[in-house]
A protein has these predicted regions:
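N-terminal alpha-helical transmembrane segments of multi-pass membrane transport
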Residues: 2-3, 7-8, 12-137, 148-152, ...
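Extracellular loop-to-transmembrane helix junctions
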Residues: 71-99, 148-187, 373-380, 479-492
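Helix-loop-helix module between adjacent transmembrane segments
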Residues: 89-90, 131-132, 161-188, 197-235, ...
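Flexible loop linkers connecting adjacent transmembrane helices
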Residues: 95-123, 145-147, 151-155, 167-208, ...
Length: 520
């Protein structure tokens, strides 16, 4: 097939760049322009030079996108929008995250799955596809980063935003189902860029305003697919591989190239292939990781109450309130959103493809994502990091290295399991985010074969860039892109919420009257 052949050629180009970069890093300066620049930079490698330039670009972007409207309170505007939006949706829909929880589980179990409904994947596959993009390194590395930067108190805010984020995700995924486009061949186009454009026009907004909302979201979604959905995953996967084979920095190019090739093998199959892969990977890797975490918590059961007290004290103590309270809150919210993506609209792209003729039903399935991702897995990881004392250990490293240290302190053999989990988490996240970014790319440039091949080639190239970049720059870029998706999505979601509320009231009435057909 032309697509497979072209993707192979693109990968070959990336592979060639990897080998070239690797050889450059291994050799002494030979007088060429790249080598000369490296020599003048005090012996910096090519990868270090690229990382330095990347850091400068990220710095300029952060100054614009993380603007703080109130100088005396250092809270970025986007964090305020996410927090206020999540609280609004929860109250507006009558705490649906609580009263609709059991029904959401029944739907996910397949009780209402009609194989003849329009769509490409089942409710369960839609959930696992979305979870594969969220249950991942945000849970393993992101939690450690939050505690490292914001202290144990950041965990409280991760849980809070996870609970409120459940209803935010319900709103956006319901809208994705309402405004999706089902093509004659059965494929689906859906997500915030579509419901923002169409829905806002139906609310009376001018075409250009509605189109601008969709365009802005699509641009940031593509950036998010390259950042948090790609570079961060590749960076931490590379770190995990280093932990297994030794600190061989010169192999980063090679590791990045191999990861790019493996991701390319799956993404050529689209959402159906992604759904088939994630429905097998996600339950397995979640089970392994949660089981290991529970073993450690049982072994440290006596320290759990003290850890819980420390988390609360770090969040509400007077010195925290008047000192670092805002910083703790911001770090907790940023890491929670990076982990569960509630409010940013990414999961709506996957849930739009689910087989159903009831938009509210898929929205309820989507609610389970933030609960599983943040309230359960992130909290467990945080407790492991705290009870082990890893966040206070100077030699524990950062990100996934800190989590590895925390697990290894109790289970000496666990780093091997964690490294495998990291690779699986990173891999599943990258293949899901490639689909998100590809749909946004198609919204901007069309769905021609050439446009799709170009996006996939760029996506694979960013895997290599993530493998050689520093964690600091990767996290900053990832936060910028993913959090910025919330600007148009939350604002548009609030405007369109009355439509969702009307659909929910109708659905809930029919559910209580036992009007739905079951298939269990």
């Amino acid at each position: 097939m032309l697509t497979c052949r072209s993707l192979f050629v693109a990968w070959a180009v990336i592979w060639g760049a990897c080998l070239t970069g690797s050889s450059l890093m291994a050799s002494e300066p030979a007088g060429g322009p790249v080598e000369a620049a490296a020599a003048e930079a005090g012996g910096a490698t090519v990868a270090e030079m690229i990382d330095a330039r990347f850091g400068v670009i990220v710095g300029y972007m952060a100054a614009v996108l993380f603007w703080e409207p109130v100088k005396t309170i250092p809270i970025p505007l986007i964090v305020l929008i996410l927090l206020c939006g999540s609280v609004f949706f929860t109250v507006y829909f009558g705490f649906l995250n609580i009263r609709g929880f059991k029904h959401a589980i029944d739907i996910t179990r397949g009780r209402y799955d009609n194989p003849d409904d329009p769509g490409e994947i089942s409710h369960f596959q839609a959930l696992t596809s979305a979870l594969s993009a969220t249950v991942g390194l945000g849970n393993i590395a992101g939690v450690a980063v939050a505690i490292q930067l914001g202290g144990p108190g950041a965990v409280i805010w991760m849980i809070v935003i996870g609970l409120f984020g459940m209803t935010a995700k319900f709103n956006e995924c319901t809208l994705a189902q309402v405004y999706r486009k089902v093509h004659p061949d059965g494929t689906v186009d859906g997500g915030p860029m579509h419901y923002l454009e169409i829905g806002l026009q139906q609310k009376g907004f001018p075409f250009l305003v509605a189109k601008l909302f969709g365009l802005v979201f699509a641009v940031f979604c593509i950036g998010g697919s390259f950042g948090g959905g790609n570079m961060f995953q590749a960076n931490q996967a590379t770190s995990a591989i280093r932990g297994m084979i030794g600190d061989a920095a010169r192999l980063d190019w090679l590791i990045g190239g191999i990861l790019a090739f493996l991701v390319g093998l799956v993404i050529i199959g689209g959402i159906r292939r992604i759904g088939q892969v994630t429905e097998k990977i996600i339950p397995l890797m979640c089970s392994i990781y949660v089981l290991a975490g529970l073993v450690i918590l049982v072994m440290h059961a006596r320290q759990i109450p003290a850890a819980a007290v420390l988390i609360v004290q770090s969040c509400v103590a007077p010195e925290a309130i008047f000192g670092g309270f805002v910083g703790v809150m911001v770090q907790g919210i940023k890491r929670a959103v990076f982990s569960n993506e509630a409010g940013v609209g990414s999961a709506a792209i996957a849930h739009a493809a689910a087989k159903t003729d009831e938009p509210v039903r898929e929205g309820m399935v989507a609610m389970l994502g933030p609960f599983i991702d943040t309230v359960v897995i992130c909290t467990m990881t945080a407790l492991v990091v705290i009870v082990s004392g890893a966040y206070q250990e100077p030699g524990a490293g950062e990100g996934v290295e800190m989590t590895r240290w925390a697990f290894a302190d109790t289970l000496s053999w666990f780093p091997v399991v964690l490294n495998i989990s990291v690779l699986l988490f990173a891999y599943s996240t990258m293949i899901s985010w490639s689909y998100y970014g590809e749909k946004a790319w198609q919204y901007l440039f069309g769905s021609s074969r050439q446009a799709v091949i170009l996006y996939r080639s760029i996506f694979l190239g960013f895997i290599v860039l993530g493998a050689i970049s520093s964690l600091e720059n990767v996290i900053s870029f990832s936060d910028l892109m993913i959090l910025s998706m919330a600007f148009p999505n939350v604002i548009g979601g609030v405007i369109l919420a009355p439509k969702v509320k009307a659909l929910l009231a109708d659905y809930w009435t029919r559910y209580r009257n036992d009007e739905f057909v079951t298939y269990d």
